[in-house]
Amino acid sequence: MRERLRRFVTRQFGNPSGLFGKFIGNRMARGNVYDAQWTVSLLDIKPHDRILEIGFGPGVSTQIASERASQGFVAGIDHSVTMVQAASQRNADAIQSGKMELKHGDVSSLQYPDASFDTAFSLHSIYFWPDPVNCLREIKRVLKPAGLLAITVQPKDKWKPKVDANIMTLYYGDEIASLFSSAGYRNIRVEVSPPEDNVFLECILGLS
C-alpha cells in the first residue's frame, strides 16, 4: 500500500492531473516561491529578452521571469494539462498582452525554431526527463548562440520523503553539469543557494 501511494504521489509531482493534481499545483505555488526567485535572479534577464521555461508548473517562476523581461517575451511548455490551465489563469494578463505563451508540450521535441531564445530555465523538472542529454540538446537547439540554460534541483541527499526511483531520477549538481557537458554546453558552473536561507538548492548553468 505504501509503495503504491509513493508511486502515485511521485507520478502526480511529475505530471499533476485531476483534483489531486490541482492540490499538488497549489502546494508548488506556495512552496517554490523561493526556488523561483533565486533561480530567476541568476539569469541576468534583460528587458527585451526572449525566455523559455521548461515545466512551468503553476506558473510562479514564469510570472517572475516575465516581470524581469518587461519588454520581452516568455514562452513555457509543460506536459501537464492541469498545470497549463493553472499557470494560464495566473498569468492571464501577460498572455492577453502578447508577452507570454504557455502551452502543453514535451521537452524532447520543442515546437520552436532554432535560435529562438536568449535564455531557458527549468525548476524541478529534469527528474522526469527520460533521456536528459537529448532533452538538453533540444533546448540548446532553440537557444541563440551563447544563450543561457539554467536547471535548478534539490540535491538527491536532501529529498524527504523517499520517491519512486522508477519514475523520478534525483541528481547532484555535478551530475547534471556532466550531462550539460555531454550535450555540448560550455562555461558550465553550479551555484548553491545560500546556506543561511535554509533551502537546499543547486542551479546548473551553461552556455549554448
Give residue spans per PLM region.
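A short SAM/SAH-binding and catalytic strip from SAM-dependent methyltransferases
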Residues: T119-D131
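A short acidic, Gly/Pro-enriched loop at the edge of an enzyme's catalytic core
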Residues: S108-T119
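Core SAM-dependent methyltransferase catalytic element
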Residues: A183, V192-S208
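Conserved SAM-binding loop and adjacent beta-strand
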Residues: F20-V40, T169
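Class I SAM-dependent methyltransferase SAM/SAH-binding core
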Residues: R50-S109
